[in-house]
A protein has these predicted regions:
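Extended beta-strand/beta-hairpin segments
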Residues: 1-13, 20-97
């Protein structure tokens, strides 16, 4: 067999893409224009089930406070359509670089 992507990796990629798009939209609506949003996802998979997905976000957004950035990141996580479709715990850790 050849190496390939598994379904869990595709779910993680879909969540990261959706989350970044939603966060970019939320930031732009609040007049913050991100220079960079870099998000990784870590899936906890046990007994054939995705138990949780931890998003690790590093962003560069001029003129935003760290608290406001975390607030917007949580809003994006909660309102992202992919997050809403998944039946697992999703957390986000957001930091400015």
């Amino acid at each position: 067999g050849t190496l390939g992507t598994n379904p869990e990796e595709l779910i993680a990629a879909a969540l990261v893409g959706c989350f970044n798009m939603k966060l970019s939209f939320v930031l732009n609506e609040a007049n913050f224009n991100p220079d960079k949003l870099d998000t990784d996802a870590l899936i906890t998979f046990e007994d054939g089930k995705i138990l949780s997905i931890d998003l690790n976000l590093k962003g560069k957004v001029p003129k935003i406070s760290a608290d406001k950035f975390v607030e917007f990141a949580n809003e994006a996580k909660n309102d992202c359509p992919i997050s809403s479709a998944l039946n697992c715990v999703i957390s986000v850790t957001a930091s400015l670089v």
